[in-house]
Amino acid sequence: MQDVVQAYYGKELQSTADLKTSACCDADAVPDWLKPLLARVHPEVSSRYYGCGLVCPPLLEGCRVLDLGSGSGRDVYLLSQLVGASGEVVGVDMTPEQLAVAREYLPFHAEQFGYANVRFLEGQIERLEELDLEPGSFDVIVSNCVLNLSTDKPAVLRGIQRLLKPGGEFYFSDVYVDRRLPEAVQSHPVLYGECLGGALYWNDFLRMARGAAFTDPRLVSDRPLEITEPQLAALVGEARFYSATYRLFNIPELEDACEDH
């Protein structure tokens, strides 16, 4: 399915107008404090944004942040402003066409912000150990509607846990579903590219997160998704999809429930 994803995001989609569902459209209201920062991101970068939520947690100044599946770089350039000149943001993506857009506007954003604190790496999020990324070196790792596109989600979570500093967090938005999906939906190229075919069944995700030592997943927000194209809606049947934002903390000694000893 990686070839399908690369082709869909590298060649099929040229802007958000080409999307066929609301899964990869950010319907979350942009908070007022973030609007001026978003306005400083180049329009060409923003037009190729396919996220499903906001992955800009507060209090990032001076932090080292990694964005998995960074695409055209919109979130990277937002985060660049939040971490400031003393921080760093690294984007990882496997799609050359998306990376080309992100890298083309590196000089533009460095001039806009008054500093250069961003770099982009080409690679697969399931194989982060192959990239020039030091274990235990990131304060925060983010991703936006990306984990569902992976064919080996446990490997992604293990790689994230390996790269986070003790006490660091994985702050991410993704697509979830209220049941396990049949093979016909999982393997459908458009549904997969639209972030639905690989959507995480809620309970499978929670088990997966705990298996990667993220013992207490915290839900930040969620919203239902709409499938307006009749043929696609018929394929998914009664399944209900949601965009949700979670926080996973790298605290190995953390218990899996709130306790009062």
Name each region found by the language model.
Residues L60, R64-L68, V76-L128:
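Class I SAM-dependent methyltransferase SAM/SAH-binding core
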Residues E129-V140:
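A short acidic, Gly/Pro-enriched loop at the edge of an enzyme's catalytic core
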Residues D139-D152:
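A short SAM/SAH-binding and catalytic strip from SAM-dependent methyltransferases
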Residues P154-E169:
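A short glycine-rich, Lys/Arg-flanked "PGG" loop and its adjoining helix->strand segment in the class I
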Residues Y176-L196:
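Short, glycine-/aromatic-enriched active-site segment of Class I SAM-dependent methyltransferases
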Residues G198-A213, L219:
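Short alpha-helix
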Residues A212, R218-P224, E229-H261:
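C-terminal lobe and adjacent flexible extensions of AdoMet/dcAdoMet transferase-like proteins
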